[in-house]
């Protein structure tokens, strides 16, 4: 069976016709159907289908008008901002008025004044005026706190208030150094071992001779008289006076013409017991009697030994009498209560002495 693949022209009549692809002005045709180009054009900005050319021109005008509206809308805020800024600047310039003085009735010109007066609203004259009137109250301008205060807060003749002056003076004042010099009553409140000094004139030579603390406040008055020409200078010898032992100072002086003696008297306590005085004298005599150095100083010969012949006196005499015999260098001498020394029939004043220490 043979197939006839030849189709009838009636069946392929639609296929035999070639499509007309010739471009038409403003239209595209497919399969014999043609449509205007404007039918398939889309507005890229608005996304709307534009049917004909008249609508295209109308939409274009709308787009142009819309763009102009947007531009005008964007331009208006900028203009308003600039105008508002101009207004604020103008207001700022208008509000920057020249300050005036706070004092009642003062119309001073601050154009040539310093910034200090402009800031505190006071003219140069009223800043130094003692009394000004502000709102009916009498006040005064403080130079340090730069404010007006009542007159009660100021001292007379001061330009600053009392509060500021107090702080200012406290900062400026420095602590005064204490007086280094020794006061007159340096030994007034001293308690304990007493310092024994011997002097016969305007010069005072303190020594380190101290009494035994067990003696209490009782002091010793000793007088030694020296006679002879073997010593040409006034000297003073200390027996003991070292920290290890106690002793007494014996001033010795000589003069070729007259007999001089030296004494230093310190008051005894009036209520002292006689037994204490006796033990004190025994201590003094034992120290002098047992000392070889004292013998070498007081005597030119080693064989001559001074002896204590007279016993200690009672407390009422207020003196201790010491008598030395030997080579004739010393004579009887006693210290009386008035501070003078009696040697024989002659009362002699105390000469100047110089301390000499030995152990």
UniProtKB/Swiss-Prot annotation:
<keyword id="KW-0805">Transcription regulation</keyword>
<keyword id="KW-0539">Nucleus</keyword>
<keyword id="KW-0238">DNA-binding</keyword>
<dbReference type="GO" id="GO:0006355">
    <property type="term" value="P:regulation of DNA-templated transcription"/>
</dbReference>
<keyword id="KW-0863">Zinc-finger</keyword>
<dbReference type="GO" id="GO:0005634">
    <property type="term" value="C:nucleus"/>
</dbReference>
<protein>
    <recommendedName>
        <fullName>Squamosa promoter-binding-like protein 13A</fullName>
    </recommendedName>
</protein>
<dbReference type="InterPro" id="IPR036893">
    <property type="entry name" value="SBP_sf"/>
</dbReference>
<feature type="binding site">
    <location>
        <position position="101"/>
    </location>
    <ligand>
        <name>Zn(2+) 1</name>
    </ligand>
</feature>
<dbReference type="GO" id="GO:0003700">
    <property type="term" value="F:DNA-binding transcription factor activity"/>
</dbReference>
<dbReference type="GO" id="GO:0048653">
    <property type="term" value="P:anther development"/>
</dbReference>
<dbReference type="GO" id="GO:0003677">
    <property type="term" value="F:DNA binding"/>
</dbReference>
<keyword id="KW-0862">Zinc</keyword>
<dbReference type="InterPro" id="IPR044817">
    <property type="entry name" value="SBP-like"/>
</dbReference>
<feature type="zinc finger region" description="SBP-type">
    <location>
        <begin position="98"/>
        <end position="175"/>
    </location>
</feature>
<feature type="binding site">
    <location>
        <position position="145"/>
    </location>
    <ligand>
        <name>Zn(2+) 2</name>
    </ligand>
</feature>
<feature type="region of interest" description="Disordered">
    <location>
        <begin position="75"/>
        <end position="94"/>
    </location>
</feature>
<feature type="binding site">
    <location>
        <position position="126"/>
    </location>
    <ligand>
        <name>Zn(2+) 1</name>
    </ligand>
</feature>
<feature type="binding site">
    <location>
        <position position="142"/>
    </location>
    <ligand>
        <name>Zn(2+) 2</name>
    </ligand>
</feature>
<feature type="short sequence motif" description="Bipartite nuclear localization signal">
    <location>
        <begin position="158"/>
        <end position="174"/>
    </location>
</feature>
<feature type="binding site">
    <location>
        <position position="123"/>
    </location>
    <ligand>
        <name>Zn(2+) 1</name>
    </ligand>
</feature>
<feature type="binding site">
    <location>
        <position position="161"/>
    </location>
    <ligand>
        <name>Zn(2+) 2</name>
    </ligand>
</feature>
<feature type="binding site">
    <location>
        <position position="149"/>
    </location>
    <ligand>
        <name>Zn(2+) 2</name>
    </ligand>
</feature>
<dbReference type="GO" id="GO:0008270">
    <property type="term" value="F:zinc ion binding"/>
</dbReference>
<dbReference type="Pfam" id="PF03110">
    <property type="entry name" value="SBP"/>
</dbReference>
<keyword id="KW-0479">Metal-binding</keyword>
<dbReference type="InterPro" id="IPR004333">
    <property type="entry name" value="SBP_dom"/>
</dbReference>
<comment type="function">
    <text>Trans-acting factor that binds specifically to the consensus nucleotide sequence 5'-TNCGTACAA-3'.</text>
</comment>
<feature type="binding site">
    <location>
        <position position="106"/>
    </location>
    <ligand>
        <name>Zn(2+) 1</name>
    </ligand>
</feature>
<keyword id="KW-0804">Transcription</keyword>
């Amino acid at each position: 069976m043979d197939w006839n693949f030849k189709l009838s022209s009636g069946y392929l009549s639609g296929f035999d016709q070639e499509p007309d692809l010739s471009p038409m002005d403003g239209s595209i045709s497919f399969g014999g159907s043609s449509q205007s180009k404007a039918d398939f054009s889309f507005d890229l900005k608005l996304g709307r289908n534009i049917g004909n050319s008249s609508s295209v021109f109308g939409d274009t005008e709308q787009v142009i008008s819309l763009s102009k509206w947007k531009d005008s809308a964007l331009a208006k805020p900028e203009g308003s901002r600039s105008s508002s800024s101009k207004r604020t600047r103008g207001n700022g310039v208008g509000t920057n008025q020249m300050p005036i003085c706070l004092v009642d009735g003062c119309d001073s010109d601050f154009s040539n004044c310093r910034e200090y007066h402009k800031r505190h609203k006071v003219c140069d004259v009223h800043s130094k005026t003692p009394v000004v009137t502000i709102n009916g109250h009498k006040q005064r301008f403080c130079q340090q706190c730069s404010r007006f205060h009542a007159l009660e807060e100021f001292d007379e003749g001061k330009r600053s208030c009392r509060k500021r002056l107090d702080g200012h003076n406290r900062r400026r004042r420095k602590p005064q150094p204490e007086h280094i010099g020794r006061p007159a009553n340096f030994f007034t409140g001293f308690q304990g071992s007493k310092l024994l000094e011997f002097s016969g004139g305007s010069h005072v030579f303190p020594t380190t001779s101290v009494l035994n603390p067990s003696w209490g406040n009782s002091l010793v008055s000793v007088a030694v008289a020296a006679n002879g020409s073997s010593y040409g200078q006034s000297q003073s010898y200390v027996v003991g006076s070292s920290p290890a032992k106690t002793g007494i100072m014996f001033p010795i002086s000589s003069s070729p013409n007259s007999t001089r003696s030296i004494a230093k008297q310190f008051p005894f306590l009036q209520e002292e017991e006689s037994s204490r005085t006796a033990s004190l004298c025994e201590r003094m005599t034992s120290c002098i009697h047992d000392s070889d150095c004292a013998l070498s100083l007081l005597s030119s010969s080693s064989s001559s030994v001074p002896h204590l012949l007279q016993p200690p006196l009672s407390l009422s005499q207020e003196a201790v009498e010491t008598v030395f015999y030997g080579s004739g260098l010393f004579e009887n001498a006693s210290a009386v209560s008035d501070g003078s020394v009696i040697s024989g029939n002659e009362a002699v004043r105390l000469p100047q002495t110089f301390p000499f220490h030995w152990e």
